[in-house]
Amino acid sequence: QPHRHFQLLRRSKFEISCPREKWFLEMKSNNISDCSLKKNIIVSSFNFLENSATLYELYLELSEKLGLGHPINDEKPRFPYNILITNNWIAIIKRSYDHIHGFSINSLGFAGYLLVTEKSDINYLRNYGPEKLLESFV
């Protein structure tokens, strides 16, 4: 990963965090990995407002479980990844690719905010849908 950045999405207390929040919450409670997308994502409950001091430890634990490594043993992560942190849950997505079918997907893409540009293969998206597009990145 050549760079890292945060993207903050402000939400009111009872507003959903992202369009795919229900999907992430269902993944958290269901360990069935019926597609490569689900096999490369780890989701955990986390109360950010009450436990912000332990966020880094949870991040390290989840990163190791997903096979990304640990800063003590690995100079850099073993795989590129994206991370989503809400007030109630955290998700880490292990990626294999940065660009596919003219799309560049970051954390917001996995959250449900796909950016379509003139380079994007809109026909691929129409024919296979967003889930298949996201799956091709892992």
Mark where each language-model region is:
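HIT superfamily nucleotide-processing domains
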Residues: 1-138
